[in-house]
């Protein structure tokens, strides 16, 4: 995006599609943290006005996947959640450390069924060996 804004084109530039390179969990989302002590009046109201609830929910779910697999920001885990009309489309890809073996899973569920559907999805990832794969 920055290269486009600056009008810079490079012959060796390739924009990856999500099918080629799924992003890490919460990649590209901006998080703002505030200190409870000494907070200026109105800060929470301002932040609530710029918070996108769908992005907030999707990134929380992406991070839940990483946590379920006992991963970290250094783990080879990609997760992308997209919420449209209260329906989540979740794509997850995990690999071993050198990327030679991968597991890819996706699911679609209503946000009304989030808790049970997400638990079933996380359990399925674990059952197919995703935890072990990221450690190998």
Q: At which residue positions do the language-model features occur?
A:
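Small-molecule-sensing regulatory modules
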Residues: 1-136
């Amino acid at each position: 995006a920055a290269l486009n804004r600056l009008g810079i084109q490079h012959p060796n530039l390739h924009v990856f599609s999500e099918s080629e390179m799924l992003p890490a969990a919460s990649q590209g989302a901006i998080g703002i943290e505030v200190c409870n002590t000494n907070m200026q009046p109105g800060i929470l109201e301002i932040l609530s006005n710029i918070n996108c609830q769908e992005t907030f929910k999707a990134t929380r779910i992406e991070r839940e996947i990483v946590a379920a697999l006992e991963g970290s920001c250094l783990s080879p885990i990609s997760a992308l959640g997209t919420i449209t009309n209260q329906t989540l489309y979740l794509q997850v890809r995990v690999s071993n450390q050198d990327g030679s073996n991968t597991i890819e899973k996706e699911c679609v569920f209503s946000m009304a069924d989030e808790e049970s559907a997400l638990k079933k999805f996380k359990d399925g990832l674990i059952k197919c060996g995703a935890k072990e794969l990221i450690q190998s």
